[in-house]
């Protein structure tokens, strides 16, 4: 079966593992998933990200992060631009997620960026997801 939206699948796997309080999540690797995982690590939503090479496409291992009392760091993830309805925005109209408490992941001509980085670099692009 062909997967029509690997980004939505990746976000759903993170959401499900987070709800079940798993420590580690493994997903099939791709460049876009690696970029999203790196942004999540840089912004402090996950502990660590490892890429494991194998004979096929590789595996991304994401180490989820929780607070001291076991509360989830990632409250929710939402896919915005979908294969059936793409969502593009200019840098002036870049959305702020929960007034800056969350991030938007944007695919730009300069690669994957957060909404804040895209605003600073004055580049727009496709809004892939909101994470808060």
From Swiss-Prot:
UniProt cross-references to SUPFAM superfamilies, sorted A to Z: Ribosomal protein S8 (SSF56047)
GO cellular component, one term: ribosome
UniProt-listed Pfam families: Ribosomal_S8 (PF00410)
GO molecular function: rRNA binding; structural constituent of ribosome
Gene Ontology BP, a term: translation
Keywords: Ribonucleoprotein, Ribosomal protein, RNA-binding, rRNA-binding
Quaternary structure annotation from Swiss-Prot or TrEMBL: Part of the 30S ribosomal subunit. Contacts proteins S5 and S12.
Functional summary from the UniProt entry: One of the primary rRNA binding proteins, it binds directly to 16S rRNA central domain where it helps coordinate assembly of the platform of the 30S subunit.
NCBIfam families: PRK00136.1
Similarity comment: family membership: Belongs to the universal ribosomal protein uS8 family.
Name of this protein: Small ribosomal subunit protein uS8
Native source organism of the sequence: Streptococcus agalactiae serotype Ia (strain ATCC 27591 / A909 / CDC SS700)
């Amino acid at each position: 079966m062909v997967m029509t939206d690997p980004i939505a699948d990746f976000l759903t796997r993170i959401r499900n593992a987070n709800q079940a309080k798993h420590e580690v999540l493994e997903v099939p690797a791709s460049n876009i998933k690696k970029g999203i995982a790196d942004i999540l690590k840089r912004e402090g939503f996950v502990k660590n990200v490892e890429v494991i090479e194998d004979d096929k496409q590789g595996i991304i291992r994401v180490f989820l992060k929780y607070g001291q009392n076991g509360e989830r760091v990632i409250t929710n993830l939402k896919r915005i631009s979908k294969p059936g309805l793409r969502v593009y925005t200019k840098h002036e109209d870049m959305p702020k997620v929960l007034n800056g408490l969350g991030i938007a992941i944007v695919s730009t001509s300069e690669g994957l960026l957060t909404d804040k980085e895209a605003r600073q670099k004055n580049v727009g692009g496709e809004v892939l997801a909101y994470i808060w």
